[in-house]
């Protein structure tokens, strides 16, 4: 009986010693425990978290294609979906882009990839913002109802990226 108690105490001590501190990240260590620098941004994405908020008053879908072109569908200041196109480049972990009218994205983003298989996610951070995008299929209704950016009134055309 005494040996059993000692054995249980040793096991508990070993388990306690193996634990890492939380560091305020919901059960994990730092950001590198969840995100990796290795991955591919190619795919269809929906913005699911913006600056730590999951309750978004706007919608953003982003399609990054293998040929370094992108399609951005957004409704930010109206209920209209607006469609933008352009090209993007990935230099290490820096993602930047240029709209088809020649205007650059508002900023470049550091990109990281989720380490978990499902749901597949990417994290885009800039000096002022952090967005988490989750892999999805862009709904046909969004694509079909989107207004091309060139015909949108200027008050509704503030670009998300």
Annotate each language-model stretch with its function.
Residues 21-84, 94-161:
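Lipid interaction determinants
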Residues 1-5:
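Positively charged n-region of N-terminal signal peptides that target proteins for export
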Residues 15-18:
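C-terminal motif of bacterial Sec signal peptides marking the signal peptidase cleavage site
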């Amino acid at each position: 009986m005494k040996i059993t108690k000692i054995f249980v105490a040793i096991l508990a001590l070993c388990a306690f010693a193996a634990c890492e501190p939380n560091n305020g990240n919901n059960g994990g260590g730092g950001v590198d425990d969840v995100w990796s620098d290795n991955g591919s941004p190619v795919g269809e994405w929906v913005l699911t978290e913006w600056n730590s908020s999951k309750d978004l008053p706007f919608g953003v879908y982003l399609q990054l294609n293998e040929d370094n072109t992108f399609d951005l569908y957004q409704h930010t200041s109206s209920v209209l979906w607006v469609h933008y196109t352009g090209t993007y480049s990935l230099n290490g972990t820096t993602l930047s882009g240029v709209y088809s009218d020649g205007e650059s994205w508002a900023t470049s983003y550091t990109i990281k990839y989720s380490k978990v298989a499902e749901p597949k996610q990417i994290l885009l951070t800039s000096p002022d913002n952090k967005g988490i995008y989750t892999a999805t299929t862009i709904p046909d209704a969004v694509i079909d109802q989107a207004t091309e950016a060139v015909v949108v009134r200027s008050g509704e055309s503030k670009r998300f990226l």
